[in-house]
């Protein structure tokens, strides 16, 4: 068999099985709430399951997204991500959830989730949401209550309040541990002059009325 044929077969098989390799492992049982810290004997990629005899309905309910977070900060926003660590019932299900509250003229500074895509639902208010692809192209939309927007996995994205009252969004991410890389936190203090400059830059995107897609000179693109 020619080398090119073997290579094509290899690439085809890789394409078929790669999604299973790079995504969260599928559950091997109906449910698997995370075991309490004291019951863990080994470290692993994920968490051990509780004994089936101790699983309760309360393992699948959380109140952690019921209330708005603290908005008394420079960016006037709060983002609360709930993973399997905080909500045991999520263990092995490959999802996590988040609530974001943004005061008037507030924003969620640019960040990314290295292990998950994010689907965001606007619960109340109006926001501008956008992300940058790897070529620096900005994809941005103005969203109203009930709208949904997608942030692709690993891409830098942001949210800004575009209304005259509190804006609240809820998100689902397709990993029980999506990770958060905050651009401002990674490079400089969130209350620094550079962070303030980023905030001003984001507000300029909003005020220019950019929508759909545009190429911009992004200070946090790399």
From Swiss-Prot:
Cupin type-1 domain location: 72-195
Residues bound to Mn(2+): 111, 113, 118, 157
One term of GO molecular function: manganese ion binding
SMART domains: Cupin_1
Domain of life assignment: Eukaryota
A Pfam match: Cupin_1
Disulfide topology: 32-49
Entry's Gene Ontology cellular component terms: apoplast
Signal sequence region: 1-23
Subcellular location: Secreted, Extracellular space, Apoplast
Keyword terms, alphabetized: Apoplast, Disulfide bond, Manganese, Metal-binding, Secreted, Signal
Keyword Ligase: no
Oligomeric form and interacting partners: Oligomer (believed to be a pentamer but probably hexamer).
UniProt similarity note: Belongs to the germin family.
Biological role: May play a role in plant defense. Probably has no oxalate oxidase activity even if the active site is conserved.
Protein name: Germin-like protein 11-1
Organism of derivation: Oryza sativa subsp. japonica
